[in-house]
Amino acid sequence: MHRLLLASAITLALSACSSKADEVPAGSQTAAPATLDGVELIPREALFGNPERANVQLSPDGKYLSWVAPLDGTLNVWVAPAGDLSAARAVTRDTARGIRSYFWSYRPDTLLYLRDSGGDEDFHLYAVDLTSDQSRDLTPFEKTTAQVVGVSDRHPGTVLVGMNDRDPQWHDLYRVDLASGERSLVERNTHQIGEYVADADYVLRYATRSRPDGGLDLLRRVGEGWEQYDEIPFEDGMTTGFAGLTKDGGTLYMRDSRGRNTNALFAIDTATGEKTLVHEDPRVDVGGALADPVTGKVQAVAANYLREQWAVVDDAIAADLARLEAIGPGEASINTRTLDDKTWIVAYSAAESPVQYYRYDRDGNGGGELSRMFSGRPALEGKPLVPMWPQELRSRDGKTLVSYLTLPAHADGNGDGKADQPVPMVLLVHGGPWARDAYGYSSYDQWLANRGYAVLSVNFRGSTGFGKDFTNAGDGEWAGKMHDDLIDAVQWAVAEGVTTEDKVAIMGGSYGGYATLVGLTFTPDTFACGVDIVGPANLNTLLSTVPPYWASFYKQLVRRMGDPETEEGKAWLSERSPLTRVDAIKKPLLIGQGANDPRVKQDESDQIVNAMTAKNIPVTYVLFPDEGHGFARPENNKAFNAVAEGFLAQCLGGRAQPIGEEFKGSSITVPTGAEGVPGLAEALQSHTQEVRR
């Protein structure tokens, strides 16, 4: 099921890897300078350029170490013998957007990766044979997005893949041969199934089907058909779902919020239906889980309130996790475990610390060898990165808003997380909105803080992870109470001396871009300026143009937002659309958009830009012809952020690195408003556009 409507464009723009820890660059603690001029300017290239290495993994047999790294400036997959990193070689040859998402199959010397074209999110699945370095498209069909359903060590030569080439709304299920690329039909999806669960033998066991009321039917396999055995009410649709199946098929894991507020992880006996609680946290929903690679049994469960904490439920790895926890005060994540579970790849990071990759060879009692391999972004080692401070704010109606504050180095001399003096602030709003902000390294937080701004990220109502009541409190509240929470957070920051009322900008991607537009139209006196990245301006056209394969989620979506197919719904969505209040805009606005965005179409940005232009309201519009829902190519990401940096400096008074050569290799265009950002028009005159899909 598609849990996120509008994944954060900021996150997409940063993603060069598959785990958050992979994105964490380096930092060091030094004496705080008295003024911003005393803080070293961190180059945008170090923050937003390609990582040196990311998404580090071991093959299941432990034979190879792999990672993502640049090849001629474009991210590709590299492989080395596990014991000889100097023998690394690139095994993919992408020259456009780069490879970010990859994983190992159980077929010897074969890995898999996903790639779309120009940000259209029609992801194809490719197999790479390391003996020949040849890539094969396993899903070679137009307008098709692949969904990987199963990869099993019991059937190493094949994978289960959903493909929507027959019907763009629904994925049929195929078994695909990794050597030949041939596919054989497992199930033609005539039941409008949104999610399949198969066991280790690729036998279909469970599925979900959307209900007209926005809830879900839970189905189980009976013979060659399906029967409904339970349901998920609409209210639990965001917080309840399947969470895995043990390899013997005897235990089904579910995250379940039915009959409670926060969801918990349960183990269900597939033969008897007996349900056993594995882990719960009264403050938050359960998060990720670690499972034994041999059995599939859950061994540890995460919960993230202010920071992520792991609860061990299998003593077999208790000593190992304690060993990793002792690396430092940051957070350790396990990227991969070999099939025999003897070797782990670990990424350690903190908000202001580098990602450090470790190899951990287990001895069974936590005393194995833990060896550091390398840093993901060594260019940031020794740079003045700053901490992130978790906060618990109060909304006007008494809700707790878990938030995160980042202060510029010169504004927090004693490092206590409290501002010594007010500084300009950027309210950085996450996407989704069914997502959350969390502790950890953020290149945007570090960039903005280094330029002299405090950064506040708020988990407003509607965010996920804090129980279904908090998530459901956002229903029908786009541009309503969800926005009130953001305003309350700004008022908190002013009252705490973090900033002043006249020096607050709002910025965000996707839903965060929408929140930016709402900020400048619904509350036009609150913010000094706004930066909108792929944010929708017209909720009616947004919901009328979602990708066809969102069909399994659409009923829930419109119930939470409004139905564009009813007159009442249209009126409601129009009322909550920034486009209807363009006349109210009186502060500077910068908009960034990808021309191929399948979620928030280019027309969303075009509509508000055209409306503003017709009313002679200034706006700067940056458009990338080879991007989608966010800016994946580092050249484009750096180009947009160079523009945003100059825009914010003019608005808030922070410092800005000149645009310089930052447009090199990018596809940037500025259809209107280049004169609104210092140096932008001049930089465009000398720029030669490079479009890569």
Label for each model-derived stretch:
Residues 14-16:
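C-terminal motif of bacterial Sec signal peptides marking the signal peptidase cleavage site
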Residues 19-53, 80-100, 129-146, 176-194, ...:
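Multi-bladed beta-propeller domains
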Residues 41-78, 344-345:
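Beta-strand-rich domains and repeat architectures in extracellular enzymes and scaffolds
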Residues 50, 68-76, 94-99, 106, ...:
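A flexible loop/linker signature enriched in serine peptidases of the S9 family
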Residues 54-57, 89, 100, 123, ...:
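Non-catalytic accessory segments flanking enzyme active sites
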Residues 62-65, 111-112, 159, 205, ...:
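Hydrophobic beta-strand positions that form the internal "hydrophobic ladder"
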Residues 376-502, 509-510, 515, 537, ...:
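Cap/lid segment of the alpha/beta-hydrolase catalytic domain
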Residues 460-693:
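Active-site-proximal cap/loop segments of hydrolase catalytic domains
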